[in-house]
């Protein structure tokens, strides 16, 4: 059966046409013959090279690299094998940018290129073996740049003298010195903790107890934060001063000092951070020099012994110049912090409850048990102001924020009044901006955070009695502490500079929490 026209066309499209293929092959052969005729000299050279290679022995065609230079009679340059990309060491050394730091041992260091198979590619001659450290580093760099060439954007651009002068002139005229000082460092100048803290709930997490590595054998009576470093000082009736490093993970004990003759009531870091002042219910106190490890005993206040039965309660002004001792019958005695010598004394009417200094040390505030506040000028030894706490009775403790704006006064009934000293009239008694009644037991501990946004108030009259107050809104955080928060009977409080909250209790533990807002 003969194939019709449609079937033949389909067969040619799928399998091709043998006649067309033969004619195409003949045309290709003719083209190849023409090219060979046009280049007769090239073909003769190739034939000559093939004849020469056929006459060579197999041993002459190949070279076995054994890694040793003993059997090598002639040193064949390996630059030929590497090609034109090989850079001579002398040229490369001259083109290198001078290093900022150089190691003198690099020139004395000798490295063998024959012992390690991976280093043989760095040789320039077959029998080359030992190179110094500088040559070795230079060849490694060259080998790397062969595989990964330097991109155009990383190459140093040639700057003409005119462009250099123009850039220097524009830099001097546009960028002032103050901006240049900022650009020299990569330190962040934005303080994330300066943002306002939101009221209502607080994000807080518990860390390992601050004194976990070396717990106290008695209740914690007083705590103090180092003015410059994350260090915590604790003291108690076990007669031991302990300093811990607050890292939140281990909190290691840095050092400790045992004073056999005094059950300690108060211990504070001096504002210079180099000394610790401690005292118990005795007529003397100790000044511990942390740098020299020397302990100085201060005693015998001449002329004031009758009004100072003990030195167990004292305060150090922020300038580090004076130590204020709480005495009997409303007396406050000031000592020179460096020498321990008596400086002067102040007196109020009634029973003394608490003493504090303003942040600049210019004024001393004294609280009486009869709900009266006295302002003294320290240098002039005079009364600046005196006012009565509104609806106050049996005031026990007060606290001033670092900005000298808010004054919190606690009472025996648990009421806490907060006053704004900067907006109040100096001639009249200030009015409280808010009154907190969340605690119904005597207030014995209060502390402001470093940015004055959080106020912690506590009482040891009942277990787990502590509240955190959002100062801008004067509201109590409702989510912390919870009924499961292990606080115990709180005896003292302290805020760290990084948002750490230290809580000491009668069981001798110092709980440590971290406010996430200050991370």
Curated annotation (Swiss-Prot):
It comes from Schizosaccharomyces pombe (strain 972 / ATCC 24843) (Fission yeast). Keywords: Nucleus, Repeat, rRNA processing, WD repeat. WD repeats lie at residues 26-66, 71-111, 216-254, 259-298, 306-345, 347-386, 390-429, 438-479, 485-519. Component of the ribosomal small subunit (SSU) processome. It is found in: Nucleus, Nucleolus. The keyword Repeat applies. This is Probable U3 small nucleolar RNA-associated protein 18. PROSITE patterns: WD_REPEATS_2, WD_REPEATS_REGION.
